[in-house]
């Protein structure tokens, strides 16, 4: 291959400087024709080269920028590039690395002429050059004509784990390469405008053209440009007599690493137990503009990356496992990839999706999120910090088995996840760094929510990772239970689960206390039409309905039943829940207007009379106060309940001495239904003798004031509270 450049000489003549084949020193000729009218015939008449020689001239292409154009028509005018003509002359008797229109740098004279092209391996779908998106070939400015050296290397790595590759070094010596080597490189570098072939058998001690028995396992690295700092080039200079000529860049990647570019970054976990090799080729680049990084050149069929399907040619490789590829040289990246693939366990690839000006296949906008600039290095460091937010399960740090849809620590793999396990254990497994749930910073109403995840992602994760869900709807109910239990939290304390909302993990260090404190009866699980309602829990400091506090006292020991109710100052932590009480609730759950229990009737000697004023049982405390004149102690008439039928048998005559746990919302069950006793939900208390009994408000209305401040004259509702809270066997919680 030869290169030349020409500039305008004197009036009516053109100076032509050309490189002939592999010679290092250029030649200068003067052609007595103006530069704007010089043709190939004029150039040939001066050189008088053999007829089989090829002539390449430097020109500007509208799509690719600076290219080397072959001209064979003697009448064609030679392109004038910035007032000069740049050319390369290739003799027909010199073996060349390429027969494609773009000319290439010189081959060493030690390489024999290329035989017919061997077939490509079945794993490879395309070469690096032709597999990259169009955005990798922008127009290049004329500043490249200074021929300053830049470095751009590319390596195709077919990573195979099944058998080690050892070759005798004498088989692939410094001067001997197989005849198939040049043709293999020709096929693979067909998409490049320039290339300088550097045989690098040091990487794997295999030949470049190992295309027969070890085709998919060969490693090679080629440099498209000359660099005095290239380690590989220094080796080849020591090994070969002739120095490859200095070439200017003829193609460049688009600056996808600029801070103004928005990148969609994904993390892919690959199961290497099912596949023998990774199946990607990487392209590395660094230049004076600061653009750098390792890019996916092409993807080979049959590999782990091709089976996953999410990584595309042109994506930027940011991190592999815990190794950051930002600003890493191409040779170091090849070495790191080779070492990682040879180790057991899964491989986690963090890639930035490439921006393509013609998005048709793999370019998609992030879901429901604005596009913002991102720094890949900052993202990787943030991701590394995020992985330490939640401790993994005890066990080996390396995961022995992994499926394409899950990657759980060893502590969970042995036993698996099921709906019968503790919710906290399932949530901890979901919060593990390698669980597969996408947890990252989210933007909502211009507010950054750190370490958030989408509700639909939680449902999908539960449905695919937890055994026991017959359909996805059940997994959604389970996610609603996680929200009620406080294991996941909404940003604004929304207590109704929605798949379109962002959530964060709650306190995963607490045990049964943190789980029970947030449970309530008959809460909407979000699985029906009521899931569209935006039910918000109160902010801290608001009225406790339905308050979600934490336990501030030790559990007392269970105590035998007592026929006396506890004094109301001991029931100050009791909270009501659940909207307005209506006739759908059993009479035993109403706080007003019901018949005295057996204990109460025995003391008074006669039943309470019912007043017909209140029908709904949802009167406020102020209404009870207004009727205080009709209320008497000791069983006098003046009840404020409705005139409905007497309460169910199961709700009368029960010992009332129990204290409701904070945050529990008792509701009545359908009439006539016996309910099991749940010791987790109620604790029996030994009450002191009640000196004064006061009335409590019916359920469904938020308390206006503390129960301890209710006047002692309001006593008519004591019996209804008797029945609502007296029998723990009817107190139940339906978690799901």
Curated annotation (Swiss-Prot):
It is found in: Cell membrane; Cytoplasm, Cytosol; Cytoplasmic vesicle; Nucleus. Residues 218-230 have a biased composition (Polar residues). The keyword Ubl conjugation applies. One of its GO terms (molecular function) is protein domain specific binding. Residues 159-171 have a biased composition (Basic and acidic residues). Gene3D superfamilies: 2.30.42.10, 2.40.240.130, Winged helix-like DNA-binding domain superfamily/Winged helix DNA-binding domain (1.10.10.10). Keywords: Cell membrane, Cytoplasm, Cytoplasmic vesicle, Developmental protein, Isopeptide bond, Membrane, Nucleus, Phosphoprotein, Ubl conjugation, Wnt signaling pathway. Changing residue 66 to D: Reduces oligomerization. Reduces activation of Wnt signaling. Residues 232-244 have a biased composition (Basic residues). Residues 111-122, 558-568 have a biased composition (Pro residues). It is a peripheral membrane protein. CDD domains: DEP_dishevelled, PDZ_Dishevelled-like. Changing residue 61 to A: Reduces oligomerization. Reduces activation of Wnt signaling. InterPro entries: DEP_dom, Dishevelled_C-dom, Dishevelled_fam, Dishevelled_protein_dom, DIX, DIX_dom_sf, Dsh/Dvl-rel, DVL2. The keyword Ubl conjugation applies. Residues 267-339 form the PDZ domain. Residues 11-93 form the DIX domain. Belongs to the DSH family. Interacts through its PDZ domain with the C-terminal regions of VANGL1 and VANGL2. Interacts with Rac. Interacts with ARRB1; the interaction is enhanced by phosphorylation of DVL1. Can form large oligomers (via DIX domain). Interacts (via DIX domain) with DIXDC1 (via DIX domain). Interacts (via DEP domain) with AP2M1 and the AP-2 complex. Interacts with FAM105B/otulin. Interacts with DCDC2. Interacts (when phosphorylated) with FOXK1 and FOXK2; the interaction induces DVL2 nuclear translocation. Interacts with MAPK15. Interacts with PKD1 (via extracellular domain). Interacts with LMBR1L. This is Segment polarity protein dishevelled homolog DVL-2.
């Amino acid at each position: 291959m030869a290169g030349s450049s020409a500039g305008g000489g004197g009036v009516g003549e053109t100076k032509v400087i050309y490189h002939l084949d592999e010679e290092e020193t250029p030649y200068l000729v003067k052609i007595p024709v103006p530069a704007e009218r010089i043709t190939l015939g004029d150039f040939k008449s001066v050189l008088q080269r053999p007829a089989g020689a090829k002539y390449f001239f430097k020109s500007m292409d509208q799509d690719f920028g600076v290219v080397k154009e072959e001209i064979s028509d003697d009448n064609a005018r030679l392109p004038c590039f910035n007032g000069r003509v740049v050319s390369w002359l290739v003799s027909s008797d010199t073996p060349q690395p390429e027969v494609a229109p773009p000319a290439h740098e010189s081959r060493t004279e030690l390489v024999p002429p290329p035989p017919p092209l061997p077939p490509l391996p079945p794993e490879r779908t395309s070469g690096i050059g032709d597999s990259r998106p169009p955005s990798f070939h922008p127009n290049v400015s004329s500043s490249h004509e200074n021929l300053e050296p830049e470095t751009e290397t590319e390596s195709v790595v077919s990573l195979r784990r099944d058998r080690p590759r050892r070759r005798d070094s004498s088989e692939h010596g410094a001067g001997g390469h197989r005849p198939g080597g040049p043709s293999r490189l020709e096929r693979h570098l067909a998409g490049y405008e320039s290339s300088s072939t550097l045989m690098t058998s040091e990487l794997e001690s295999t030949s470049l053209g190992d295309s027969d028995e070890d085709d998919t396992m060969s490693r090679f690295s080629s440099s498209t440009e000359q660099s005095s700092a290239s380690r590989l080039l220094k080796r080849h200079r020591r090994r070969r007599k002739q120095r490859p000529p200095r070439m200017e860049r003829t193609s460049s990647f688009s600056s996808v690493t600029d801070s103004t570019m928005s990148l969609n970054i994904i993390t892919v976990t690959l199961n290497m137990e099912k596949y023998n090799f990774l199946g990607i080729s990487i392209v590395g680049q660094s230049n004076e503009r600061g653009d750098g990084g390792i890019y996916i050149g092409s993807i080979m069929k049959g590999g782990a990356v091709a089976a996953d399907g999410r990584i595309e040619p042109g994506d930027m490789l940011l991190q592999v496992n815990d190794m950051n590829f930002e600003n890493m040289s191409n040779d170091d990246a090849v070495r790191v990839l080779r070492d990682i693939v040879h180790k057991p366990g899964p491989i986690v690839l963090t890639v930035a999706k490439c921006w393509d000006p013609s998005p048709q296949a793999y370019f998609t906008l992030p879901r429901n999120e604005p596009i913002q600039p991102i720094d890949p290095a900052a993202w990787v460091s943030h991701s590394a910090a995020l992985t330490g937010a939640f401790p993994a399960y005890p066990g080996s740090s390396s995961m022995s088995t992994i499926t394409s849809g899950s990657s759980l620590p060893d502590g969970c793999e042995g036993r698996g996840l099921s709906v019968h396990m503790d919710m906290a254990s399932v949530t901890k497994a979901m919060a593990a760094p390698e669980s597969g749930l996408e947890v990252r910073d989210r933007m909502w109403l211009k507010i950054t929510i750190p370490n958030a995840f989408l509700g639909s992602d939680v449902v999908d994760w539960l449905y695919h990772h937890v055994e026991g869900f017959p359909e996805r709807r059940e997994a959604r109910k389970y996610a609603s239970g996680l929200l009620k239990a406080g294991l996941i939290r909404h940003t604004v304390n929304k207590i109704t689960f929605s798949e379109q909302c962002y959530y964060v993990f709650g306190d995963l260090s607490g045990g049964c206390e943190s789980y029970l404190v947030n449970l309530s009866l008959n809460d909407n699980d979000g699985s029906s039409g009521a899931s569209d309602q935006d039910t918000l829990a109160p902010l801290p400091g608001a009225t406790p309905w339905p308050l979600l506090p934490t336990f501030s006292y030790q559990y007392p020991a269970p105590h035998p039943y007592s026929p006396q109710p506890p004094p109301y100052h001991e029931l100050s932590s009791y909270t009501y829940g659940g909207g307005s009480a209506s006739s759908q609730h059993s009479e035993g759950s109403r706080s007003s207007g019901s018949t005295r229990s057996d204990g109460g009737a025995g003391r008074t000697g006669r039943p309470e009379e019912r007043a017909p004023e209140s029908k709904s049982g949802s009167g406020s405390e102020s209404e009870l106060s207004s009727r205080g004149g009709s209320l008497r102690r000791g069983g006098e008439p003046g009840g404020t309940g409705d005139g409905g039928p007497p309460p169910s048998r199961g709700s009368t005559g029960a010992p009332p001495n129990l204290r409701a746990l904070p945050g529990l919302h008792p509701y009545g069950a359908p009439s006539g239904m016996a309910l099991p006793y749940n010791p987790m939900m109620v604790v029996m208390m030994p009450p002191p003798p009640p000196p004064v009994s006061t009335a409590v408000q019916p359920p469904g209305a938020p308390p206006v004031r503390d129960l301890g401040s209710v006047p002692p004259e309001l006593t008519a509702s004591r019996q209804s509270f008797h029945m609502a809270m007296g029998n723990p066997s009817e107190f139940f919680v339906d978690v799901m």
